Amino acid sequence: MNTNKATATYLKSIMLPETGPASIPDDITERHILKQETSSYNLEVSESGSGVLVCFPGAPGSRIGAHYRWNANQTGLEFDQWLETSQDLKKAFNYGRLISRKYDIQSSTLPAGLYALNGTLNAATFEGSLSEVESLTYNSLMSLTTNPQDKVNNQLVTKGVTVLNLPTGFDKPYVRLEDETPQGLQSMNGAKMRCTAAIAPRRYEIDLPSQRLPPVPATGTLTTLYEGNADIVNSTTVTGDINFSLAEQPADETKFDFQLDFMGLDNDVPVVTVVSSVLATNDNYRGVSAKMTQSIPTENITKPITRVKLSYKINQQTAIGNVATLGTMGPASVSFSSGNGNVPGVLRPITLVAYEKMTPLSILTVAGVSNYELIPNPELLKNMVTRYGKYDPEGLNYAKMILSHREELDIRTVWRTEEYKERTRVFNEITDFSSDLPTSKAWGWRDIVRGIRKVAAPVLSTLFPMAAPLIGMADQFIGDLTKTNAAGGRYHSMAAGGRYKDVLESWASGGPDGKFSRALKNRLESANYEEVELPPPSKGVIVPVVHTVKSAPGEAFGSLAIIIPGEYPELLDANQQVLSHFANDTGSVWGIGEDIPFEGDNMCYTALPLKEIKRNGNIVVEKIFAGPIMGPSAQLGLSLLVNDIEDGVPRMVFTGEIADDEETIIPICGVDIKAIAAHEQGLPLIGNQPGVDEEVRNTSLAAHLIQTGTLPVQRAKGSNKRIKYLGELMASNASGMDEELQRLLNATMARAKEVQDAEIYKLLKLMAWTRKNDLTDHMYEWSKEDPDALKFGKLISTPPKHPEKPKGPDQHHAQEARATRISLDAVRAGADFATPEWVALNNYRGPSPGQFKYYLITGREPEPGDEYEDYIKQPIVKPTDMNKIRRLANSVYGLPHQEPAPEEFYDAVAAVFAQNGGRGPDQDQMQDLRELARQMKRRPRNADAPRRTRAPAEPAPPGRSRFTPSGDNAEV
């Protein structure tokens, strides 16, 4: 799929055929042209007001359907006409195949004198052929299917229905369009020759029993031998041999006429009749043979054929009693074929649209559009440019996966026309990889489509929509890590520095001198993908596989393989179905691309690509598009499996290389890439790694790892599991199992370092950071609201740089450090007993004066927590420094703006000092003193206590007017 356009063009052409054709991206790369053909019919409604449209949505030729009317009594159908494309394709083209098709069926033309249209439409898609439909009445049409997505009922004719062709298969061959071949000048006038539609024909064969022919009632009257269903819409060829013998010699020559009638839906009038006549005489009555050989061109198939009838008659009355017995000279049979009948879409499935109670003589409009891939005939090819189809497995598989989820996404074959028009916006979103699927989110389908895109479509095209121009450069750096799987589950490369390459071009790394390594460079073409869940094997071993892509230097990625006992070549891709042998022919292994240099245990093993190990022990294996496994890790796994593993599968991935002595394991490269593959399954990578295990005995490795290998499987969580290995992968220098792979990765690292100072490096890191932190949706919504980045620019112009606050030790370590510090101080002061443990028991306090005096006097260690007050001098009752006590008392009581503290309060403060040995009050004692002060201030006064009054205010001096000047009262 072209990620520059970021559009699934093939899927878009299927769901929106009016947008035009797009080449089918499969591996049929014929030169062709793309052509869109229209079909437009105005069908006149009969007097009954009812009829049926038979649509062939997948037919690759020009005939796309047929129209039938019900008779006036609605007791029988009458064929009206074929529905075909505007151009007869076989006139100009030799081969073709259908890409997509759509019909719109609606009525909007009023007959003269009417003001409104009546009538309704029923439509249903039937998975079988037309002859298998039991009833074509309006009401019984809905019983053809139980799938609600394949039927529409009681839709007004003015609203209309839409029929959409959804492919039933994607293996579509080019079919011959029954074109006429050039003829010579001496040909008879009117004679012509055509290439018949003989690709995948549907063949019918009527086998008659070896018994008596049923008697005829009279001469010239047909007697039926067989009558049954058959579907034919294209040319057919009839061949047959009906042989019989008469019981008696005929009196006269008797003519036997065997007649094969091809009939349609509407009546018993044959569309085409094939007759074979033979004379029974005295010479041949013991073995008479009637041969049938006739070709019927498409022009003679004037309506869809749904029934055949084989009958016979005779011309002699005397021969009626002469018994004829079939099969005298061999089987009696008649066969005929339906051209292209087994091509998907030619005869099945079909869509039936019935209309009822429409106004007679009103018009029913059928407007269709069909998209084709066509190969012109030689005459037209001289003046027309053709192009090869592009093989795009991603585009094809994305279409497959979307259409395989048609029920969840509500993609239908028949629609109410207004619903289909409403859904076109969703279809455009699904096929546009740069869309964030806002409409699909409203319908509840965004998660499904996103999940499919992650598997089958380029992830970078949906990673950062506004960075679409950078996609081509992004896949050089981190694209390989974020876009990991191709359509259908096939791996893509995931090493840094390389473009995306399908495993079609990859090769499992190994020794170049392997027995099969060179012969298998030209691998088989295969596109099959399967997953198979197997029960827990009796034993097994998991090894990593490193793949490289020679067309892209530096390309490398990893996967896992599990080697189990048994022969399972059918579970391997055709490229991996290689059988290798142990030394001295002591066993074999499927899926290994080189012979094993040591002896086996006379058993056969199979190396299968591993996808998942479930908790119950079941293993899920898959077919991947890659070559067979080669390399030292596979040989190490086989050595452990043959010599050491007796039961079960160790939950770990083994890597390493067995030395020549077959006992020593030497270092091996590729640890980083193998670790990514192992960690995705929640498995550890175990074995000989550079700098970890320089040299380990084979037996000791098995004893140490296998016996303890009971680790539970824990799958990596999150959708960004590959991103977190980016730093490790870029920093590593070891990514291969041989010198060639090491050289390739060194080139990758050098190329990655070249862009570290470029602006693109910052953009790519930003994209990775955005996806890693799940900010893609938020950034995309912000970009729509702030297209000029004015708000965002102001927001991030000064990024926050908060220095990280140093984290101190936790409480336990802090207390231990405190105890150690107090212990050192106490020991320096002479208290040798004060160890950190003793300080901790003493409530993390140093020795008190009593404890220190006790130690000095007795020489024994004091008990932690005991103050030994008897060994210290009792404090004085009232300290001599009363000034200090008064200052504190006045401060607590409330001076200097309130009354001085009473003597009782001084005494209370002095008592606190005495209690503390001369020290001031602690926090609790200070709170008690403040409470005592408040109580003393609220204490009521005695009546004898004089109340202090204020002195009266002095009167103000007499004022004067500011207009009266000072001096005498003289006249101004």
UniProtKB/Swiss-Prot annotation:
Its EC number is 3.4.21.-. Changing residue 704 to S: No effect on polyprotein processing. Changing residue 500 to H: In strain: Isolate Heppel, Isolate NVI-010, Isolate NVI-011, Isolate NVI-020, Isolate Sp103 and Isolate Sp116. It is an enzyme of class 3 (hydrolase). Changing residue 54 to I: In strain: Isolate NVI-010. Changing residue 682 to L: No effect on polyprotein processing. Changing residue 152 to A: In strain: Isolate Mason, Isolate Blake and Isolate Tseng. The sequence shown is that of strain 31-75. Isolate Sp103 is VP5-deficient. This is Structural polyprotein. It comes from Infectious pancreatic necrosis virus (strain Sp) (IPNV).
